[in-house]
Design a protein with these regions (language model features):
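Conserved, structured core segments of small domains
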Residues: 20-155
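Bacterial Sec-dependent N-terminal signal peptides
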Residues: 1-23
Length: 155
């Protein structure tokens, strides 16, 4: 019995210590000005429109004309991003005709269609877009500025 009492007496403090949880780090302070800048609602979220770019009806063969079309495509992406209309863009692997993604910082599909129509890959028929509304973190609007700080080269 003494051994049991001794073991319990020794082990209790260790069990108590293990049961203590570490306090979670303090949450960053809410920045109302930043929230307004990125269009955040009270949950830090906002509406977007995803445009999934797929292979279109008239793919352009390799050559100078195609190179110019894609040069215009990248210029259009940069323009829309600098205007704050395009939160994110990038390519897919091309499997099943999925070529790329635009995440527009607009909540209306019709506006996203107008923006997409300004892109040479769409107007040429190289790609077509499929649209979906999306509700996500408004912090996504900070990606373009961050990207510019980590990219050595531009398209």
């Amino acid at each position: 019995m003494r051994k049991l009492l001794f073991i319990v007496t020794i082990c209790l403090p260790f069990g108590y210590a293990l049961a203590q949880t570490q306090p979670s780090p303090p949450r960053p302070a809410f920045d109302a000005e930043l929230a307004k800048t990125v269009g955040a609602d009270e949950y830090g979220m906002r509406g977007y429109v995803l445009a999934v770019l797929k292979t279109g009806p008239t793919p352009m063969p390799a050559g100078k004309e195609r190179d110019e079309m894609f040069k215009g495509h990248f210029a259009n992406i940069n323009r829309l991003a600098s205007e704050g209309k395009l939160a994110l863009a990038g390519p897919f692997d091309g499997v099943n005709g999925w070529r790329g993604l635009f995440i527009f910082a607009v909540s209306d599909i019709e506006e996203a269609k107008r923006l997409t129509a300004t892109d040479p890959v769409i107007s040429s028929g190289e790609m077509v877009a499929e649209y979906h509304k999306y509700y996500g973190s408004a912090a996504l609007m900070l990606v373009n500025d961050g990207h510019n700080k980590v990219a050595k080269k531009s398209f």
